[in-house]
Amino acid sequence: MVHLPTFIARHLLTTAKYYTFRRSISALYITGDKAKKNYAPLQPYMDFEGTLNSLASLEDSIKARGLQINLNEIKAKYEKFNSLQSQIKQAEAERDSVSNKLREITKAGAATKDEIEKLKQSGVELRNHLKTLKTQSYPIEEDFVHSFLSLPNTLHPECPQNNFEKLLYRSPTARCEQQQPTHLAKKDLIRFIKNDRYYLLGTPAEFDVYSMQALTNYFVEKGGFMQMSNPDFVRLVLLEASATPLEHYHLVQEEDKPSEINRAYLTGGATFEGFLGAFARLVVYPTSLPLPCVAAGRSYEIVPNTSGLPDSLFTATQSNAVQTFVATRTAEEAYEQMEKILNLAVDFYKELRIHFRITYADASTLTNAECLRANIEMYSPAEQRYICVGRVSNYSDYVSKRIMFCIRGKNNYAFPHLVGGPVLYTTRLIALLIENGLKLEDCKLLGDREVRDEEGAAGLNEFKDLFK
């Protein structure tokens, strides 16, 4: 059995490109002078005062992540921006005052012609002054807001720092220490050409699909997750909202561009970004949370090869994956849901009888939106290092504020805390099982097809018995 990438996927990856230029215009925040040619599909919630008046935790986050961000410079930009906004409000108030006065004296008929002309002239001057102030404010506003949106999330107390990983769990199965051939040596099972073009043959092709379906069903049946189907394409505004580095995905070359700014990227449906479109500008009641979701599908994440070794299934761009996404009310609930996802993942991987571990990643490896990340890793005897086969991240309320995903309260609105991540990359799992000498056909998958078929047959027989 041959598992070939679909024609559409190959075409998209062939025509997709990533450009490394710095964008001068943000799709997430568009100033008034650019609003004529571009529209803003989202208006992020930005708490300038609250963020810039409590800099201690933010400074710690910036330092731990190794980011080159000058908070004093951003604060100076804010003061300049705020000063201009105050001048604009004052000019608008003066113009309104002149307009009201002119309307009143004209209605009363008590003003002379000179007084009316003087007020009209004053109104024209204020209008021109206001126009000048707004023109001056646009580049200042854009510079400040873009700098503000580049600020990272504050770190979770459990997040390790200083190039340190915290071990959460290690499976009892012993690690294979002996050097083994690479999985690419199995030419009868894997034909690898490059990262976006490979072929799985026979059992690996079947395992690729069944493992994804099995884990998805396990989360639905055991964890009570709601299964969703997400689009393979995500607009730039959502990538910016989730602070996703643009080099992670391919930019799609669109023939008909609905927007020169808000371009489409090929992400795959089993990605965190793939969920955001369904929750952007959504308002939910507190009683509907927590809201656990899971999606099975493709992931087209570009994996940088930092090992110096040849490309393999560990760096493949295309992979089947299982993505989790949970919205919660509080930070405490988010942490509990993160543990729940990890516990379900541990149940699944333990049945494979292979060594694996779960670690908290160092702060320097997180994206700006993440405050905590747990990596699910398996050991590669061929490359003598751990490979990430899945992960779960905590985003607190950082992303929900930027996509305006709100909780309706009695007197105000709050923002959900989000957790989630791809708990399985099938290509990496297949490669590691092969390298560790396990036969794919002998691996037990929780919630696999055989178990479901047996349960379905039993249910059908019970249904037939009703008519005897």
Question: Locations of the language-model features?
Answer:
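A positional/structural detector of protein chain ends, strongest at the extreme C-terminus
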Residues: 1-3, 467-468
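N-terminal alpha-helical targeting/anchoring segments
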Residues: 2-3, 7, 11-13, 18-170
